[in-house]
Amino acid sequence: MKTAKIYQYQLPMDSGVILREQRLQQRDGLVIELSDGIHTARGEVAPLPEFSQETLEQAREDLISLTQSWLNNEELDLDSNCPSVAFGFSMALLELEKQLPQEGNYQAAPLCSGDPDDLVVKLNEMSGKKIAKIKVGLYEPIRDGMVVNMFLELISDLSLRLDANRGWTTKKAEQFANYIHPQFRSRIEFLEEPCTTPEESLAFSKATNIAIAWDETVRDDGFTVETQEGVAAIVIKPTLVGSVEKCISLIEQAHQLGMQAVISSSIESSLALTQLARLAAWKTPETIPGLDTIDLFKMQLDTSWPNCDLPVAQLADLEVIWEN
C-alpha cells in the first residue's frame, strides 16, 4: 500500500550567506517521503529565495496535490508542477524505484571566498584536478579581474569557473577582461552569464576568447541546447530547472554537442546535496559538479555529506505537515 508524508525543515545558515543582497539566515524546505509498502524514499523541495519562481507556500500546495495524484495512481506530469517540486518528487521516485546509483561524486569545485592568501595555500594543497569557483560581479570589475589573474598566476595548474550572475554591463565585462592576462584566459574553464543579456555575453566571449556558460539562460522560456561560439557549458541547478528527467535530457543534449554539463547546487540541505552528487557521478562522470555549499549551513539533514562534521538533524524531529 502506498503512503506519503511531507516534513518541513528549518536549518540555520552561516551568517555570511547573501543572496542578491538578501541575507539568508535559515534555509526552509520540505521533504517528501514516499513508500510503496516495501521501500521508502525521500526527496527535497526547497525553493531558493530570490532565485526560484515559486515561494515555499506555493511549492507546498503543489507538492500536496502531486502527492495525492501519486497516491491515487494517476498519470503524473512532473514538469507541469513548479521546478522545486518536480525535482524533489522525481528524485524520491527515482530512489523508490532504485534507479539512482549509490556512488556519488563528492569532489566539489571549492567556492573561493575569504582571504585570498589563505585560499592560495588551500588551493595549492588540493589533490587531483584543480578547479575552483569564484563569484564575480559583486565588487568592481577591475578588482575581480586582478583577483582572478592573481590566482591563475600563482597556481599554474589551476582552472577557474567564474559566475557573474548577469551582473555586468558590456563595459564592465570588458574592464574585467582587460585585467586577465591573455595567456591565462584559456584556464578560465568558463564564466557563467557575464552580461545582462545572452547576446552581450556571446559578444564578450568572441571579443576576449574567454569561454562562457549558460546558467540563468537554461531556465529561460524556449531555451534549447545548441552549439554557439564561445559557449563551453551549461550549468544545471535541478531545484530551479525541474524534474531529474528534464535535467538528464539537458545533460544528454549538451554532451551530444561536445559541451560540458555541470550539476550545481541551489543551497539544498545535505539530503538533496548527496543525491545531486550521486546524479553527477551517474550522468556527468567526467565533470566536477558545483556542490561546494554544505559549509554554508550550521546543520545537516537526514543524510550526512562525506567528511562533514556538522550535526545532523533527523527527520523524526521535524514537523510533519501532511500525511495520508
From Swiss-Prot:
NCBIfam families: menC_gam_Gplu, PRK05105.1. Keywords: Lyase, Magnesium, Menaquinone biosynthesis, Metal-binding. InterPro entries: Enolase-like_C_sf, Enolase-like_N, Enolase_C-like, Mandelate_racemase_C, OSB_synthase_MenC1, OSBS_N. Converts 2-succinyl-6-hydroxy-2,4-cyclohexadiene-1-carboxylate (SHCHC) to 2-succinylbenzoate (OSB). It is an enzyme of class 4 (lyase). The keyword Lyase applies. The keyword Zinc-finger does not apply. This is o-succinylbenzoate synthase. It catalyses: (1R,6R)-6-hydroxy-2-succinyl-cyclohexa-2,4-diene-1-carboxylate = 2-succinylbenzoate + H2O. Pathway: Quinol/quinone metabolism; 1,4-dihydroxy-2-naphthoate biosynthesis; 1,4-dihydroxy-2-naphthoate from chorismate: step 4/7; Quinol/quinone metabolism; menaquinone biosynthesis. One of its GO terms (biological process) is menaquinone biosynthetic process. Gene3D superfamilies: Enolase-like C-terminal domain, Enolase-like, N-terminal domain.
